[in-house]
Amino acid sequence: QVPFAPRPVIPGAFVPIVSQNFDLNGVDGSYTFSYESADGSARQESGVVNAPGTPLEAQAVQGSYTYVGTDGVPVQVNYVADENGFQPVGNVVAPAISRAVAAQVAQARAEGPILPGVPTPIPFRGRPF
């Protein structure tokens, strides 16, 4: 065994996708997608661009995912990701972690940029090629 090497991932049985949907609105940057697998795992997400064309333009996403953990317990996570960061809520997300993330976002917002004069990144516009 090699020290500090990652354990190999041994794929399990093939799990078919029983439903899927993807809709991209190339005009305003909004999208939705979802899928469900035969093993009961699923994911859905939708996103919109808030304040388009302004300095406050930002992608806002909300969604959820579910699966059965290795211990047989169903896992469900709902989330929002926006200008306030990634905010997960679910039966595997400890409330203390959610509070710590919220505190970090508030602190970063209060502190402002690390270096004055560093340009603001250009917002990502998820458009097809």
Swiss-Prot record:
Listed GO CC annotations: chitin-based extracellular matrix
Keyword Cytoplasm: no
Residues modified to Pyrrolidone carboxylic acid: 1
Domain (Chitin-binding type R&R) ranges: 28-98
UniProt key word DNA damage: no
Keywords assigned by UniProt, alphabetized: Cuticle, Glycoprotein, Pyrrolidone carboxylic acid
Residues modified by glycosylation: 120
UniProt GO molecular function: structural constituent of chitin-based larval cuticle
Record's function text: Component of the abdominal endocuticle.
UniProt protein name: Endocuticle structural glycoprotein SgAbd-9
Organism expressing this protein natively: Schistocerca gregaria (Desert locust)
